UniProtKB/Swiss-Prot annotation:
Reaction equations catalysed: UDP-N-acetyl-alpha-D-muramate + NADP(+) = UDP-N-acetyl-3-O-(1-carboxyvinyl)-alpha-D-glucosamine + NADPH + H(+)
First-tier enzyme category under EC: oxidoreductase
NCBIfam families with a match to the protein in the record: murB, PRK13905.1
Obligatory cofactor(s): FAD
A Gene Ontology molecular function term of the record: FAD binding
Protein name: UDP-N-acetylenolpyruvoylglucosamine reductase
Residue ranges constituting the FAD-binding PCMH-type domain according to the UniProt record: 32-195
Pathway: Cell wall biogenesis; peptidoglycan biosynthesis
Subcellular compartments: Cytoplasm
Superkingdom per UniProt: Bacteria
Length: 302
């Protein structure tokens, strides 16, 4: 595959930024992972549509990248085209409803909403995700999930057709949604709750403080590695088997929160995967509970 020629063709007629053999360690919160064959960074609806149609025409594998959180890219990298959405950020407010492009960062959306006196999204304070990625995985905390607020989601299906899906047409479950199979999220519309600005900001600060005090945010990480099994907290299970502080290469089970694996410097995806396997095996053997990954895994090993 001539990546330079493909990149040039993808850029034709647009001021689209396209990178070849781009290390995805630069674009993920874990700061690790191999290269993308092609990385495109659309800044408008037109550019996003063009990227998706280009991948279809060329038969390229397609991955949609938001802020790179909740994601492990293997060391061999990702074949085909990776489209990074976070360069196209737009927010429109109409009454209690707020429409955001998929690449809008949740912290930015929360800031805009709070200034307008719109509450209900405070549980998402500190989640380092784009709106598109967050709605696909139904991101949230024990205080709430994004799917609870969704009015509608605009998607482009795999044939390039546009659909507006209402909440009732989408299945939201714990850290998952049917949007995984729907295509590419373009915009998300949420319905929030009017409230006093100081009260909203107080809740945001309380949630940020709680997150900072309980999570190892001083180290590169991808958020929670495992889903909580029904009736349990994954972090407590991992702690119960004595896995806090376990280390493989530069990857370590965080002392502050055992459901986080941190990159202490020069960690590889292979280090992380080996640590994940060790933790899962220990929890299954000692407690009889299978831990399911919350993170996504892309690409191929070396």
């Amino acid at each position: 595959m001539d990546l330079t020629a493909l990149a040039g063709e993808l850029q034709t007629g647009l001021k689209l930024q396209v990178l070849t053999n781009e290390p995805l360690s630069r674009h993920t919160t874990w700061r690790l992972g191999g290269p993308a064959d092609l990385l495109a960074r659309p800044r408008s609806r037109e550019e996003l549509d063009y990227c998706l149609s280009f991948a279809r025409r060329k038969g390229l594998p397609l991955h949609i990248l938001g802020n790179g959180s909740n994601l492990l890219v293997l060391d061999g990298g990702v074949r085909g085209l990776v489209v990074q959405t976070r360069e196209w950020r737009q927010v429109i407010i109409e009454g209690r409803k707020i429409l955001a492009t998929a690449g809008t960062l949740l912290p930015g959306l929360l800031q805009v909403a709070s200034k307008k006196g719109l509450g209900g999204l405070e549980f998402a304070a500190g989640i380092p995700a784009t709106v598109g990625g967050a709605v696909v995985m139904n991101a949230g905390t024990p205080a709430g999930c994004l799917g609870d607020l969704v009015v509608g989601v605009e998607v482009l299906d795999y044939d390039g057709r546009r659909h507006i899906l209402e909440n009732r047409e989408i299945t939201f479950t714990y850290r998952h949604s049917s949007l995984h199979r729907a295509g590419t999220v373009v915009t998300v519309t949420l319905e929030l709750v009017p409230d006093e600005v100081p009260a909203i900001r107080e809740r945001i600060e309380a949630n940020l403080h709680r997150r900072r005090s309980r999570q190892p945010l001083e180290w590169p990480n991808a958020g929670s590695v495992f889903k909580n099994p029904p009736g349990y907290y994954a972090g407590r299970l991992i702690e119960a088997v004595g896995a806090k502080g376990w280390r493989v290469g530069g990857a370590e089970v965080a002392e502050k929160h055992a459901n986080f694996i941190i990159n202490r410097g020069q960690a590889t995806a292979a280090d992380v995967m080996e640590l994940i396997d060790r933790v899962r095996e220990a929890v299954a053997r000692q407690l009889g509970i299978d831990l399911e990954l919350e993170i996504e895994v892309w690409g191929e090993g070396l």
